[in-house]
Regions:
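Short, small-residue-biased leader/transition segments that mark boundaries at the very start
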Residues: 1-2
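Glycine- and other small-residue-rich loops at beta-strand/loop junctions that grip anionic moieties
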Residues: 6-9, 34-35
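Alpha/beta catalytic cores of nucleotide-metabolism and tRNA/nucleoside-modifying enzymes
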Residues: 15-32, 37-107
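Short secondary-structure capping/turn micro-motifs that flank functional sites
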Residues: 5-7, 61-62
Length: 107
């Protein structure tokens, strides 16, 4: 298995997302995967136009550590982080977050 950290010069999923969403131009839903570990990562992806962001690694870690209960706890934490992040930017629901809620990266 090859991970992004093993590929020099490859853009992170979140960095490539705006260009992918623009290229899709509403013709299809955009799903994104790779590097999403926290609820804030998911909210950022939604704000940049993704329909959803996959969070496989945290879920797999929860499974490895605590089985079904571990997965449930990881999903609970992600939900709580998403709700908090949405609240902090003044959104009640995930479909309300937009690019205007994302601060551009410095540099």
């Amino acid at each position: 298995m090859l991970f992004r950290s093993q590929l020099d010069g490859v853009a992170a999923s979140i960095d490539a997302l705006p260009e992918v969403v623009e290229a899709a131009a509403g013709r299809c839903e955009v799903y994104v995967d790779g590097g999403f570990r926290r609820g804030t990562d998911v909210v950022r992806a939604l704000a940049l136009g993704a329909r959803t962001a996959f969070v496989g690694r945290p879920v797999a870690a929860g499974l490895a550590v605590g089985g079904e209960a571990g997965v449930a706890r990881v999903l609970e934490l992600l939900r709580d982080e998403i709700e908090l992040a949405l609240g902090l930017v003044g959104c009640a629901r995930p479909d309300e977050v937009t690019r205007a809620h994302v601060q551009p990266a410095a540099g």
